[in-house]
């Protein structure tokens, strides 16, 4: 029997929160977000937006939405992924 296996995982959220647990290392390989006027997403290494959590990536977009496919090994998050979103109806990430 032949088949295809992948170590890719998917997480989706419609509000601020933990996408990948803080106890888990992750490499984001793609990001998609629904479009709305003046949308933004911020991705933090850690458990929130406060002290001790590092802002890794910020994306600002409008009604066109967002599709990012990260080449190579992806964007590394050593202590989980926390999502801070504004205006967008939802965000989906794929990660290993």
Segments from the language model and where they lie:
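Surface-exposed, low-hydrophobicity beta-strand/loop segments enriched in small/polar/acidic residues
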Residues: 1-96
């Amino acid at each position: 029997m032949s088949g295809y296996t992948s170590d890719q995982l998917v997480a989706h959220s419609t509000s601020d929160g933990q996408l990948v647990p803080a106890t888990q290392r992750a490499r984001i390989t793609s990001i998609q977000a629904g479009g709305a006027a003046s949308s933004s997403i911020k991705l933090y290494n850690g458990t929130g937006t406060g002290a001790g959590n590092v802002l890794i990536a910020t994306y600002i977009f409008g009604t066109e939405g967002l599709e990012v496919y990260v080449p190579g090994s992806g964007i590394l998050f050593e202590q989980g992924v926390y999502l801070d979103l504004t205006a967008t109806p939802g965000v989906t990430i794929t990660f290993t």
